[in-house]
């Protein structure tokens, strides 16, 4: 029966055209933003260009990397329900090295280049005359930042590649019982290694280095978990979009509404978790009213005497990423409806893009919110890149891990 499945993905010509077209839009947006801002001799003006690149690259890197976290977490939990669409998740995670290289180049230019408007702590003269930066210089310094970034992106890349390679080891033959046990054990061990790296990076140090240090005098102990929740729910939304897309083309016959329901549950649950962290971080800092901490939110929403330039996006962020999932995804039927879950997935991806925008852009433009369409254009370019790389990865290997020991569990999955 398995031989009748559409097990090989053929990239539609129209899909290729769209992905290349979106990348062209992104490249054009980069060029326009460079001409209008990036090439300006005033560092405060050119910082606007680099902030747009930083925001988009970090957001999409963390989002595609979250898909590998999903694979490893479900592997450790022996969650076989996701095996029927695992190859989709693996294909998305194959974007990590490509976007990782782009992100690395941007970060290195910002840290080692002449413009230190975004990362003030990277300027030796600024550190020399700032007691707070000098105190934090053991952690916030260019050498440690570079080494940590190389280890992080390199580790995600190599471990992700290893896990994807192991997944395809049984494509050509059915394993014996002993081989199946060994296969499960090896996958469990390597997934555990990846989870440890993920915990040490995404759940702790990397958001501090890449994003929180944009406001080097400010800190929040919830910041890394906040970033994890935002990127993970976006990653689940991205998986859902690709699964529905392939289902509509007649692929993934063994994936059904039961699997979509669980993907929707993840989106709903982590939208609520994100909101819990959003509220806790905001409420504790705002009502404690310590000037060194409230400055982060005053810069975005203002205080009693004035309205902040990012006030609209700050509250829109909460509406899209909390109220919309709460009101729409709470109902069982909405998580099982292809149209509704796809619409919500796209909305969540955009909502958390906005979340990262309001995290990054105030560091470059604290007094006004820049024209956002060019930033969106760059984001569209990254979407096209993800579409292109994911499709190429899907086309290289069978869409079904047909000899995986847990495949039966995925076939009979019911929720």
Residue ranges: model-predicted function:
Residues 13-15, 125-130, 311, 320-415:
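TerminUS-proximal long segments
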Residues 57-173, 191-195:
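Transmembrane-helix bundle segments that line or gate the permeation/cavity pathway
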Residues 62-71, 101-102, 149-161, 229-244, ...:
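Hydrophobic cores of alpha-helical transmembrane segments in multi-pass inner/ER membrane proteins
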Residues 50-56, 85-87, 216-227, 365-377:
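Non-cytosolic membrane-interface motifs at loop->transmembrane helix junctions
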Residues 13-30, 36-42, 136-316, 404-407:
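Long, contiguous internal "core" modules enriched in hydrophobic/ aromatic residues
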Residues 94-112, 269-278, 343-350:
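Hydrophobic alpha-helical membrane-insertion segments
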Residues 1-66:
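N-terminal signal-anchor module of multipass membrane proteins
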Residues 36-49, 73-86, 163-169, 214-216, ...:
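Juxtamembrane/interface segments at transmembrane-helix termini
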């Amino acid at each position: 029966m398995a031989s009748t499945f559409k097990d090989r993905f053929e990239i539609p010509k129209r899909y290729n055209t769209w992905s290349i077209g979106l990348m062209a839009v992104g490249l054009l947006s980069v060029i326009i933003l460079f001409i209008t801002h990036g090439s300006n001799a005033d560092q405060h003006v050119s910082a606007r260009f680099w902030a747009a690149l930083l925001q988009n690259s970090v957001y999409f890197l963390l989002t595609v990397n979250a898909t590998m976290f999903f694979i490893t977490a479900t592997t450790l939990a022996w969650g076989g329900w996701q095996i029927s669409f695992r190859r989709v998740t693996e294909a998305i995670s194959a974007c990590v090295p490509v976007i990782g290289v782009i992100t690395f180049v941007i970060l290195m230019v910002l840290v080692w280049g002449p413009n230190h408007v975004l990362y003030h702590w990277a300027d030796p003269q600024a550190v020399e005359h700032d007691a707070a930066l000098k105190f934090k210089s053991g952690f916030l310094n260019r050498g440690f930042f570079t080494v940590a970034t190389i280890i992080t992106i390199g580790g995600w890349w190599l471990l992700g590649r290893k896990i994807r390679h192991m997944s395809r080891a049984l494509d050509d033959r059915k394993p014996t019982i002993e081989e199946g046990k060994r296969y499960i054990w090896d996958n469990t061990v390597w997934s555990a290694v990846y989870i440890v790296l993920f915990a040490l990076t995404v759940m702790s140090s990397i958001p501090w280095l890449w994003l929180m240090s944009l406001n080097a005098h400010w800190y929040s102990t919830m910041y890394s978990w906040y970033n994890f929740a935002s990127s993970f729910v976006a990653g689940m939304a991205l998986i859902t979009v690709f699964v529905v897309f392939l289902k509509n083309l007649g692929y993934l016959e063994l994936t059904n509404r039961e699997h979509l329901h669980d993907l929707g549950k993840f989106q709903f649950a982590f939208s609520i978790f994100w909101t819990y962290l959003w509220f806790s971080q905001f409420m504790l800092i705002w009502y404690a009213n310590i000037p060194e901490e409230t400055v982060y939110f005053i810069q975005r929403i203002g205080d009693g005497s004035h309205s902040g330039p990012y006030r609209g996006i700050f509250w829109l962020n909460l509406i899209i990423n909390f109220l919309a999932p709460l009101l729409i995804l709470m109902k069982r039927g909405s998580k099982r409806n292809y149209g509704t879950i796809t619409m919500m997935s796209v909305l969540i991806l955009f909502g958390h893009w906005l979340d990262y925008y309001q995290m990054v852009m105030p560091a470059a433009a604290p007094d006004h919110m820049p024209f956002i369409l060019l930033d969106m254009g760059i984001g569209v370019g990254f979407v096209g890149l993800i579409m292109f790389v994911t499709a190429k990865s899907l086309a290289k290997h069978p869409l079904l891990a047909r000899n995986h020991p847990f495949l039966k569990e995925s076939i009979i999955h019911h929720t």
